[in-house]
């Protein structure tokens, strides 16, 4: 209605695939891995992020001590879960826990596990049981308790995100902290292409039970998208 009334004095921009004819929009911002092209489509390398590193709050020193204890490193594990493509089984979560234990056994570290609303309760029990047996320096935080996110990212030394969490990967890839992606289940199609492309460009590393520092490229999806949108609007001669 607004577009009909104001005509060229307003421009319609839609983020993600609208599942409607593209002619109804002046501009669409769609992730590159969706493989959608049109003259009014801007592709982004990943999902748009709602924060950047400079906007993260400084966590109080006493709170850092509560989180890290006397450990040198903070490892942040972010887990997704059931999604439209697959439902990880119990062995997938057990295998993930074994890889985490392998990665942390020789590190002075505190492990913080952030869960998603998609993480099933059975998975939480498996992770908790595995970590209790082999690593006392951990805490699991449910989605309803996550008042530390995203600020905790500022004190993380290593980040591990499961492959199903595309938005979380895009957000954390924008930081300089080493980022590792763990495949909960076999990925295919556009998600696999997205992850392989990020790995090729140096934004992420595949998690195989080892954590290490590397020369990480920061994903600047937001900044690059703003530049593309501004260029598009200038070409459209917006006044």
Predicted features along the sequence, with ranges:
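Leloir-type glycosyltransferase catalytic cores
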Residues: 195-239
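Short internal beta-strands
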Residues: 28-30, 110-117, 182-183
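Structural loop-to-beta junction motif characteristic of Rossmann-like glycosyltransferase folds
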Residues: 176-180
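Short, charged/polar "capping" segments at the starts of alpha-helices
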Residues: 22, 37, 85-86, 119-125, ...
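Glycosyltransferases and closely related glycan-assembly transferases
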Residues: 1-13
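Conserved catalytic-core segment of nucleotide-activated headgroup transferases in glycan assembly
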Residues: 82-114
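Donor nucleotide-activated moiety binding/catalytic core segment of transferases
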Residues: 128-167
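A nucleotide-sugar donor-handling region in carbohydrate enzymes
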Residues: 22-92, 207, 211-216, 223
């Amino acid at each position: 209605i607004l577009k009909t009334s104001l005509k060229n004095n307003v421009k319609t921009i839609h983020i993600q695939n609208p599942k409607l004819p593209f002619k109804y929009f002046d501009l669409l911002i769609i992730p590159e891995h969706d493989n959608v092209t049109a003259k009014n489509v801007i592709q982004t390398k990943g999902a748009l992020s709602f924060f950047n590193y400079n906007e993260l709050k400084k966590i109080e020193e006493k709170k850092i001590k509560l989180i890290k204890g006397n450990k040198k490193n903070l490892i942040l594990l972010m887990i997704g879960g059931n999604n439209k493509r697959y439902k990880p089984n119990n062995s997938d979560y057990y295998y993930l826990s074994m890889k985490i234990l392998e990665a942390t056994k020789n590190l002075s570290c505190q492990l913080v596990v952030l869960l998603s609303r998609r993480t099933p309760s059975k998975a939480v029990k498996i992770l908790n049981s595995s970590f209790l047996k082999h690593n006392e320096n951990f805490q699991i935080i449910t989605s309803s308790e996550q008042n530390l996110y995203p600020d905790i990212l500022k004190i993380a030394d290593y980040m591990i995100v499961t492959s199903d969490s595309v938005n979380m990967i895009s957000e954390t890839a924008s930081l300089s902290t080493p980022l590792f992606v763990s495949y909960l289940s076999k990925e295919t199609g556009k998600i696999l292409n997205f992850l392989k492309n990020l790995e090729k460009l140096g934004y992420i590393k595949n998690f195989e039970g080892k954590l290490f520092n590397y020369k990480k490229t920061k994903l600047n999806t937001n900044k690059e998208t703003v530049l593309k949108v501004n260029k598009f609007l200038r070409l459209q001669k917006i006044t």
